[in-house]
């Protein structure tokens, strides 16, 4: 019993170390890319690193190995991740402006109804934003294929989608209640939880707890 507890505790500590190292790597590489060019490649590198950790047999990667995986992916993703991430950021800006205009300047039932629709769209976009980087880390496919697959997951995997939205709300509450969590683990903690939810409940080939893969699909290298 004590031996099993010791092994479980060691693995848990290694996981926390991995999440912490990824958080530091995200901060450093985001600044390395002058923020505007470094953030989205950091998101892609973080999810690829977590995918590698989840698929590892012993899940005992050292900090140096975690950093090396992250840095290598970040360099390779400098162009593609920005081409993918900035249109997503524009969608958020447009949706936020529309929601603000309709919600705070509503004058009738129609305006209130539209603001409600925009709120639902914001939840869908939130789930999409959290899932799409995991899907993108798992498949070496075209952007449109990644977008279509992510949208299909949102509809076809309602439990996974609801867990993602709940995770986002929980992360915001936790950051507000315990700011130290944000300082130590940053975005890497909810990003890891997103990867784990997809790994456990998403049932996508190549990143499935049951380890199923399908022929004809190009998977990302672990």
Regions found by a protein language model. Name each.
Residues 1-111, 127-130, 134-222:
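Helix-coil boundary and N-terminal low-complexity module in membrane systems
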Residues 111-126:
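Alpha-helical transmembrane segments
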């Amino acid at each position: 019993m004590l031996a099993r507890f010791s092994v479980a505790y060691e693995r848990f500590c290694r996981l926390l170390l991995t999440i912490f190292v990824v958080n530091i790597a995200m901060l450093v590489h985001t600044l390395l890319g002058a923020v505007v060019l470094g953030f989205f490649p950091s998101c892609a590198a973080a999810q690829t690193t977590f995918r590698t950790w989840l698929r590892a047999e012993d899940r005992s990667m050292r900090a140096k190995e975690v950093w090396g995986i992250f840095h290598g992916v970040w360099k390779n993703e400098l162009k593609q991740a920005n081409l993918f991430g900035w249109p997503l950021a524009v969608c958020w800006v447009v949706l936020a402006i529309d929601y603000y205009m309709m919600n705070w300047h509503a004058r009738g039932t129609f305006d209130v109804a539209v603001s409600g629709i925009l709120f639902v769209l914001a939840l869908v976009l939130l789930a999409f934003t959290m899932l799409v980087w995991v899907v993108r880390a798992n498949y070496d496919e075209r952007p449109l294929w990644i977008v279509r697959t992510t949208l299909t997951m949102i509809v076809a995997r309602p439990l996974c989608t609801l867990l993602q939205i709940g995770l986002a709300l929980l992360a915001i509450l936790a950051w507000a209640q315990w700011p130290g969590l944000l300082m130590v683990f940053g975005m890497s903690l909810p990003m890891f939880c997103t990867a784990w939810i997809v790994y456990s409940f998403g049932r996508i080939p190549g990143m499935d707890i049951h380890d199923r893969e399908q022929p004809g699909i190009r998977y990302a290298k672990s």
